[in-house]
Amino acid sequence: MAEQIELMMRQVKLGGMAKGWRSVRYENTEQYVTELLKLELQEREANRINRMVKTAGFRVLKTLDEFVWNSAIQLPSGLTQEYMTDLHFLTPKENLIFMGTVGTGKTHLATAIALKACQEGRKVQFFTAAGLANLLLEKNNKGTLNNFLGSLKKVELIVIDEIGFVPLHKDAAELLFQVISDCYERKSLIITSNLEFSQWNTVFGDNRLTAALVDRLIHHSHICLLYTSPSPRDIS
């Protein structure tokens, strides 16, 4: 009979109940039904969060618990670790920009903050700069760019990782500028780069475009510097 009950629960899409109904103590009808419904709601919320994490596009999952905070991480005046990790920057649509050389933990920190946002039910998208640029070119060539940009409007936080690793094609640079401009005061960005702003023209290939992009970015941004010594990867 128990197996039949579980089968029927799954047939009517009550997987949470099917997993845990045997462990629910019966005291009275209202209490029992309430506990069963809680099981189902918890299961559905967990499944929703898992789907959001999968569709966010993270390359590797990293958590804040795994990140090592140290004196080599320089936060700007007025920004605290808690303000970032508690996601307070999302409410005023502020940006976080992590700058530093390779191996300083920029991508880890960006990923971990974005993952926490996902786990709190916020819609997130993670891209590398080169990957997003190529995707924008592809969508533009296929005539589906507007649909893609429309889908980004539903996202609360966009991560653009590794600006500076690969120079961008002129058309790709202009499209990436459009994405960043569209985010201005509408959603938050987390950007990582191994280059100072003064070197971004080597990525975007146009001084005027670069100047406009940087000006737009830094208006509502917290710029965090991550140095190479000590490196979060080297501390155990």
Named regions from a protein language model:
Residues 95-107:
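Walker A/P-loop nucleotide-binding motif
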Residues 86-93:
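Phosphate-binding P-loop
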